[in-house]
Amino acid sequence: MNVSFGILAYNESDSIGTTLESLFQQSLFTETDSSYAIEILVVPNGCTDETAKISRVTLDKLVKQSAHANVSWQVCEVEQPGKSNAWNRYVHDFSNPAADYLFLMDADIQFLEPDTLRNMIHALETTPEAWVSTDIPVKDVALKDKKNVIERLSVSVSKDVQSRERWASICGQLYCARAAMLRKIWMPVGLPSQDGFIRMMVITAGFTSPMNCQRVVLAKPASHKFEAYINLHSLLAHEKGQVMGNRINNWIYSYLRDNCNQEQDAGSLIKRLNDENPLWLRQLIQKTIAEKGWWLLPQGYAFRRFKRLQGQPLQKIISKFPVTITAFLADLVVAVQVNQELHKTGGLGYYWGKKG
């Protein structure tokens, strides 16, 4: 079995070494298993620090020390910054054409279970209808016994396990996919939010079939941790990027629904548009904004957290109210800022999109 890891990195010199060390502590690397041929490709994109250099030094050391005898590695530097472009280059240009499975990873995560990677592969091996397997992303502050208000707010906006299973969520920090299926997908150049876009391409087969959430499976037990935003400014900036990215994605979905069919799926259409007119996404967004008018976000967005309290016991409502009202005020600020930013810039190039 051929397994490829694509680690997409943007100025991660402070974290890439720790992430690679955590990767090599996985049972996939610590146990001798001749049935796996593994490649690790780090893709620094637009980096201005020593991410590439540290990756080379660390990988050279770890591969020599690994119990697994069939591990290869390469650092593939990309001059143009942007996660979407780096994703396209890894999936379609850099990864082993013979790979059975592709892992996409961020460069600033650490694994919590030693068998996370094996279990993610196993989930696909035992679920024929699934294209992608995921794990549970855990914010580092969620592991703390005592949390301040901002940390509680950060944890509260994370989806629970049941929600991830119900909505077939994909976290771009880590997922495993059947290579043949993932290679049907192309990212629009400049796309600011990738997670939801990948999910939609998978569950609709590139807008050629009805939604099928069974194409995404949650591996168990499997999880990783990542550094959460713990100050108000960074938390708001992150939420702003997420909301903006989701809104842009919805506009793209509308365009793809109108233009995709059995003869032309979303992947082939996007590849053609990227090649013929790299500015097509910007032009689509500008056209959509002109048609929408002043307010661009869904009605009632800022009040969504209060709806979650409906039907809850009074005691639970009281206990959650301080966090809910804080989150509401944050949502209100984010909504206004996102609306302004979309009118001003179209939202492209705003957010690299590492953390959740």
Task: Enumerate the predicted regions with their spans.
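Short, acidic, metal-binding catalytic loop of nucleotide-sugar glycosyltransferases
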Residues: E21-A37, K61
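Active-site nucleotide-sugar/metal-binding loop of Leloir-type enzymes
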Residues: N85-Y101
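Terminal low-complexity segments of carbohydrate-biosynthetic enzymes
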Residues: A237-G356
